Design a protein with these regions (language model features):
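Helical hairpin unit composed of two closely spaced alpha helices linked by a short loop
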Residues: 58-79, 89
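Serine endopeptidase catalytic core focused on the charge-relay Asp
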Residues: 1-66, 93-95, 99, 103
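Long mid-to-C-terminal scaffolding/interaction modules that assemble large complexes
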Residues: 35-38, 76-80
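Short, small/polar residue-rich loop motifs at catalytic or cofactor-binding pockets
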Residues: 84-87
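Generic structural motif recognizing short loop/turn segments at the entrances and edges of beta-strands
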Residues: 14-16, 24-26, 71-77, 112-116, ...
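C-terminal subregion of chymotrypsin/trypsin-like serine protease catalytic domains
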Residues: 94-139
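Arginine residue identity/basic-tract feature
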Residues: 6, 59, 82, 128-129
């Protein structure tokens, strides 16, 4: 997993480059290591486009998210780092490895953050890189 940085204006793939540097100049650790076991209370960081760098803990793994209308996404990691609209796709990591990618958050009816953010594990991203990006269970 890596970040993509836009090198120059343009519509073609060659206008982007892979980088491990965050917009604040900080560098992500160890260029691509990932973990497969997600213990509770494991400290993680996320760097979202809206929220910037946030720190929190894994609260639960293998979480299903109900989007309504019978659409349920499975296998996410629930974390308590703060995230907001516009943070989707952010890297989630600890001090030595990538954990996943910011994929969703819980919000109150007034639009305020409800205390939980959801990351798609790196193991799912790499296993499904040639398949559809999201997988759904419909009832």
């Amino acid at each position: 997993m890596a970040l993509v940085e836009r090198k120059e204006p343009g519509l073609f793939e060659n206008s982007y480059k892979i980088t491990d540097e965050l917009p604040n100049g900080e560098t992500l650790p160890y260029g691509g290591a990932s973990i497969t076991n997600f213990p509770q209370n494991y400290a993680v960081n996320a760097y979202g486009g809206t929220s910037g760098k946030q720190t929190g803990y894994i609260r639960e793994s293998n979480v299903s998210i109900n989007y309504g209308s019978g659409v349920i996404c499975e296998g996410f990691i629930a974390c308590d780092y703060r995230s907001n609209y516009g943070d989707s796709g952010a890297p989630v990591w600890n001090g030595i490895a990538y954990v996943g990618m910011q994929s969703g958050s819980s919000f109150n009816s007034d639009g305020s953050w409800a205390g939980m953010s959801y990351a798609m594990p790196t193991t799912y991203i790499t296993a499904r890189r040639t398949e559809s990006f999201f997988w759904f269970t419909t009832f």
